[in-house]
Curated annotation (Swiss-Prot):
Further facts: There are at least 7 different actin genes in tobacco.
Gene Ontology terms for molecular function: ATP binding; hydrolase activity
Catalytic activity, as annotated: ATP + H2O = ADP + phosphate + H(+)
InterPro entries: Actin (IPR004000), Actin/actin-like_CS (IPR020902), Actin_CS (IPR004001), ATPase_NBD (IPR043129)
Top EC category: hydrolase
Taxonomic lineage from the root: Eukaryota, Viridiplantae, Streptophyta, Embryophyta, Tracheophyta
Name the UniProt record assigns to this protein: Actin-93
SMART domains: ACTIN
EC number of the protein: 3.6.4.-
Family recorded in the similarity comment: Belongs to the actin family.
Compartment list: Cytoplasm, Cytoskeleton
Length: 336
């Protein structure tokens, strides 16, 4: 969250609401009935954590209100009734959800004006394009969204319920095979950090596995909060490989490369060339080193042989949805 015209968000925190497991555990600590974001994260040992956004769609409005309240009053320190608001939504956001968001902004927060933009479209704007296909992959959901002259093509949008959280879960599982144990919500956050710091995508998965068997060059160590040091090797690339092979976690779905290709194939034949040449990655789950090269290799194998394929991975892509929103909201034409 932040202000239109800024080049980076002022506040970045996980959309988590935590409630104390037992009342009275923290007597005299001025215990709150709910904690949001980083504070919920840091006190997770005594809290039950809830994620009000599931697969990119809000599923718990009371908790979502808490998150928005925290954003306005504690993070940005603004009076919401004094600022127009731009919110973003995942592409297949049900109409009822958009209406509910609008209602809460006007009735609970008294916003003077609001607009809801599609996340992937904002990422494309942030990359300086108006035509292209965006693969947007966050924590709970991934989408491929073809966009032509600034408009998302709804019939060709595909959703993949495979994203960061699933990769973290998979890493927890394969680290267990190594004899480490991670099970609680608190431990999941540690594994997420391991994933973000050490995982990468292999250009050739089978070959990488062979290399891992014979050499220890890819082994890295990671110090846990309690001081214990764990070693992670092939897990580093086995974890995000799931994006290309969802069957590894028992999902009957096409990988991100094939989903992108399928999305392009749902578009008019005349615009496919523009889409193949402008494949834009966005969201935290596209931050793995090696993802652009692998994506390019896989799509080249699927596309017509003469087709020019370009995969763009902007360095700021973790926040490109926000940056696109900042650009859009600061245009004078938009404000009218």
């Amino acid at each position: 969250a932040g202000f239109a015209g800024d080049d980076a968000p002022r506040a970045v925190f996980p959309s988590i609401v935590g409630r104390p497991r037992r009342t009275g555990v923290m007597v005299g600590m001025g215990q709150k009935d709910a904690y949001v974001g980083d504070e919920a994260q840091s006190k997770r040992g005594i809290l039950t954590l809830k994620y009000p956004i599931e697969h990119g769609i809000v599923s718990n409005w009371d908790d979502m209100k808490k998150i928005w309240h925290h954003t306005f009053y504690n993070e940005l320190r603004v009076a919401p009734e004094e600022h127009p608001v731009l919110l973003t939504e995942a592409p297949p956001n049900p109409k009822a959800n958009r209406e509910k968001m609008t209602q809460i902004m006007f009735e609970t927060f008294n916003a003077p004006a609001m607009y809801v933009a599609i996340q992937a479209v904002l990422s494309l704007y942030a990359s300086g394009r108006t035509t292209g296909i965006v693969l947007d992959s966050g924590d709970g959901v991934s989408h491929t969204v073809p966009i032509y002259e600034g408009y998302a093509l709804p019939h060709a949008i595909l959703r993949l319920d495979l994203a960061g959280r699933d990769l973290t879960d998979h890493l927890m599982k394969i680290l267990t095979e190594r004899g480490y144990s991670f099970t609680t919500t608190a431990e999941r956050e540690i594994v997420r950090d391991v994933k973000e710091k050490l995982a990468y995508i292999a250009l050739d998965y089978e070959q990488e596995l062979e290399t891992a068997k014979t050499s220890s060059s890819m082994e890295k160590s990671y110090e846990l909060p309690d001081g214990q040091v764990i070693t992670i090797g092939a897990e580093r690339f086995r974890c995000p490989e799931v994006l290309f092979q969802p069957s590894m976690i028992g999902m009957e779905a096409a990988g991100i490369h094939e989903t992108t290709y399928n999305s392009i194939m749902k578009c008019d034949v005349d615009i496919r060339k523009d889409l193949y040449g402008n494949i834009v990655l966005s969201g935290g789950t596209t931050m793995f080193p090696g993802i652009a090269d692998r994506m390019s290799k896989e799509i080249t194998a699927l596309a017509p042989s003469s087709m020019k394929i370009k995969v763009v991975a902007p360095p700021e892509r973790k926040y490109s949805v926000w940056i696109g929103g900042s650009i859009l909201a600061s245009l004078s034409t938009f404000q009218q």
